[in-house]
Amino acid sequence: MPAPPFNGVYVTATGAFYPGEPVDNDQIDDYVAPLNGGSSRLKRRILAENGIKQRYYSTGPSGETRFSAARMAAEAVRACLGGAGITSEQVDMLCTGTSGGDASLPGFANMVQGEL
């Protein structure tokens, strides 16, 4: 069965959210423990080849959660709405997709809606 056409559906804005302060390559071990003594050599090689200079973590250095997945999604939605110049009251449907949310129940979309 063919999919129905999406006439009149357009992407008019996108949003992004980066949790916390950027963590550079020298600070990674403060957030992610090394696997073993030899892992630092492998880490240096991977970091040199992948070109990534900094990243963002939703957890703090001691492993505490600073930003839930639902909160990060809600912040990205807010950025998207701002970019589109609309309010959440003007949105008819919220669809989400994730490989794993913060909890099994309620569903991730409900969690994001609650954050909004």
Give residue spans per PLM region.
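Short Gly/Thr/Asp-enriched flexible loops that form oxyanion-binding sites at enzyme active sites
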Residues: 100-113
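Acidic, glycine-rich active-site loops and adjacent beta-strand->loop/helix elements
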Residues: 17, 97-102
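Conserved "HGTGT" condensation-loop signature of ketosynthase/thiolase-family condensing enzymes
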Residues: 1-93, 114-116
